[in-house]
Amino acid sequence: MAELNFSLVIFTLLIGLCTGTFLIYGLGRLRNNSALAAVEKSSLLLMVVLLICLGVALLASATHLGKPFRFMNAFHNPGSMIAQEGLWSMALGVTLLIAALMAFKGKIIPKGLYPVGSLVSCGLLLVCSMVYVKAVGFPAWSSGVTIIYYFGSAILLGAAVVFLFSMLHGEEGTEKNLAFTALTAVFLQMIVSVAFFVHLKFGVMDVTLPTTLGMDLLRWGIGLIAPAVIAYLTWSGKLKGKSVAWSFLACVLVGEAISRVIFFMQGIHL
């Protein structure tokens, strides 16, 4: 069985949360989404939360190498995947910091910053997923499905965070809009999860992968089916209140954490 490194679970989970949240929130603001307009007043809190999560993610990335100074040494080779992760993460950090400073000064975050941050977020997600796609001798990861998996996970995590902020700080009656976005994100990740399962089942022939049926069922129940039910009932008007969004986010976080544990358990070397 592959060695499970929980630092990488934390790193990939928080990177997905940061990038996905900026993508969902930024694209919504560019489209003048009325459900997110009222959330603009809490943009400072949102950007600070994302900055903290990004900082924790980078610390986790540094510790997974065993000796944190190796993370800094990697920048001597800017073309290395670790250096690329660090550079793209810093670019996202600068974007979040600019947005936070403008919000702190009481200014509206310029819309031009959202496409820039969205491109940086996509770049960071691509680099983080390519680390595993390009890893030599790991059949379970060396597929384009890995890239789609990382993007789908980020979108789901981002939708959960934005859904929460809309419920906490948005105007009454706007929850249905974001609930539909959250529901769409869940179904997208369901499709991606099935695609990844098919890849593991029929596309990996050279190694024997560990059985993770119990964890898969747990992940689907907590991380996909439960959020789908919550989002649907909110969208249909049968559920209301801030606790709904907190429950949705909690289920998604637990589900995606389990998903990453499963992902790394499949990292069997040839």
Where on the chain are the PLM-derived regions?
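Hydrophobic transmembrane alpha-helical segments in integral membrane proteins
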Residues: M1-T19, Y149
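A short, amphipathic alpha-helical segment
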Residues: G28, S166, I262-F263
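Juxtamembrane boundary at the C-terminal end of a transmembrane helix
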Residues: A257-L270
